[in-house]
Amino acid sequence: HPSDLIVSVHPLAIAPALRALRSLGKLQVPLVTVVTDLVTGHALWYHRKAALTLVPTRAAFQRAVDCRLDPKRVKVVGLPVADRFCQPVGDKNALRAQLEWPAEQPVILLVGGGEGMGPLEENAHAIDEARLPAILVVIAGRNKDLKARLEAHNWSRPTLIYGFVHEMPDFMRAADIIVTKAGPGTISEALNAGLPMVLYSRLPGQEEGNVTYVTANGAGIWAPQPDLIVTALRDWIEHPEHRQKAAAAARQLARPDAAQQIAHILAAKLGVE
């Protein structure tokens, strides 16, 4: 392919692309890696023949250096997410009115990814049974059976059930707390919304560092059991100053300009203004 620049966003594509360039005698074509694991990315992300490696955090930068990359060819830019997740938060009450959500109590947003996987139902019931003075919004994703069960349940507290939604940026900006698994994309989107996180599950290895990154910086809490989720939520609801401190920490970590910064770097590589 007559490329002037190759960009890899997956660790398994980097070495094959470089081998292909070598076999074609086109090693002058630069390969830029955009690392999409926040902290504990696999070593395959960090190839010394890459012209430039763009990483989301300082911890990922250190990981690259530990993998013997030249620090001058590694740059911290944040994790790129869709532009819809990078807009200013704005007026929460106006957003809630638009979404037809009650405005008088804190909103807990419970998500389990687009497929509605994991212990979402168990966590929803535990939160409801705790009778917290809050509104619970549950996103069941594409899991239609789960959505039907949740809709049929007799909830003790105000609870809103959704399937797969396209308004997730507005949902995040309108909520006060998100309860989610520790995926890098959702974490980055929540940071951009200044949304404190209760993280309840993680993939071994690659997502373990995500939990440490969020909790060590004060933007969230690790709560892998339903009772721990309830404890974290109760503290943030009964002590709004604790929640506000976590929200401020999330805003401090946010990198809403990541995609634009990456685009500018790639354009500069191509000599394009």
Regions found by a protein language model. Name each.
Residues 51-107, 112-114, 141-142:
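A nucleotide-sugar donor-handling region in carbohydrate enzymes
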Residues 91-97, 101-175, 208:
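Donor-nucleotide binding loops and adjacent catalytic segments primarily
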Residues 216-217, 224-242:
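C-terminal "capping" alpha-helix adjacent to the active site of nucleotide-linked donor transferases
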Residues 168-209:
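A donor-sugar binding/catalytic signature common to diverse glycosyltransferases
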Residues 1-68, 73-76, 82:
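Active-site and donor-binding regions of nucleotide-sugar-utilizing enzymes
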Residues 242-256:
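A short, well-ordered alpha-helix in the C-terminal region of glycosyltransferases
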Residues 255-273:
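C-terminal alpha-helical cap of glycosyltransferases
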Residues 199-227:
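Nucleotide-sugar donor-binding patch of glycosyltransferase catalytic domains
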